[in-house]
Amino acid sequence: MGCDGGTIPKRHELVKGPKKVEKVDKDAELVAQWNYCTLSQEVLRRPIVACELGRLYNKDAVIEFLLDKSAEKALGKATSHIRSIKNVTELKLSDNPAWEGDKGNTKGDKHDDLQRARFICPVVGLEMNGRHRFCFLRCCGCVFSERALKEIKAEVCHTCGAAFQEEDIIVLNGTKEDVEMLKRRMEERRLRAKLEKKTKKPKTAESASKLGISQDSAGPSKAKAGKSEEADPDPREKKSSLAPRGTASNGSASGKVGKPPCGALKRSIADSEESETYKSIFTSHSSAKRSKEESAHWVTHTSYCF
């Protein structure tokens, strides 16, 4: 049986079976992971940050995502674990001197090498193109190849000298097993931080209660001191309270205050043990006193009066 024109159809043209799964080009996948932002799908440009699962982002895209409070904001696997800017780390990348960028093939007549990367490992010199495993330190943000960390075993960063632990090493764009391990570490780290916050709160409450108890214990002593002061007033206050009564008794009915007696304040020089020459200076001495005959009359007799 044939069709018009004498052609004979084959079985696969008539019977439709299940579609084959399309295979993703590995080179294209690596280029997308290492050269484009996971959130905005734009070309990576500095400052570049990485999350706790090892995915690469543009810092501007992460900030815009966190500031966006609208209900239409897309929440996917790439952003569900990012709750604040503290959940990402800014990377310290080393530039590749052989990288020419878009300037190398402006005419389109040359082969575009997709394996050429913008950044390299500062220790070994491997290019960060996805062919080699790279990781970064969460404490300082320095990026190295996994080979460099294995060959040069140290507990200090090779670039800045910061101390780190094994938990601080995060693999960039790792496999599914790597992502699951990093996710488990992230959850443990966040749970530990919550427990530390809860333990700090009771300590502050206990310190506040201790301060309150100390203030309460200091209160009765002050009250007792106040009662003793009221019961036993200062004798100086007694004298000062008695003084106005005396002045009031010396005062007249019109409200004027009388002068206090000054006899007690006066002091005679005759009672002192000084010499007679010293005593003769003062008017209280006997030599300074005159009789009525020697004293002058208040009316002066002069030649002008006659």
UniProtKB/Swiss-Prot annotation:
A Pfam family hit: Rtf2
Biased composition (Basic and acidic residues): 226-240
Post-translational modification: Undergoes proteasomal degradation, via DDI1 and DDI2. Removal from stalled replisomes and degradation are required for genome stability.
Annotated InterPro entries: Rtf2, Rtf2_RING-finger
Region: Disordered, residue numbers: 192-306
GO cellular component, one term: replication fork
Residues carrying Phosphoserine: 287
Keyword Zinc: no
UniProt entry keywords in alphabetical sequence: Chromosome, Phosphoprotein
Compartments, record wording: Chromosome
Family per similarity comment: Belongs to the rtf2 family.
Name used for this protein in its record: Replication termination factor 2
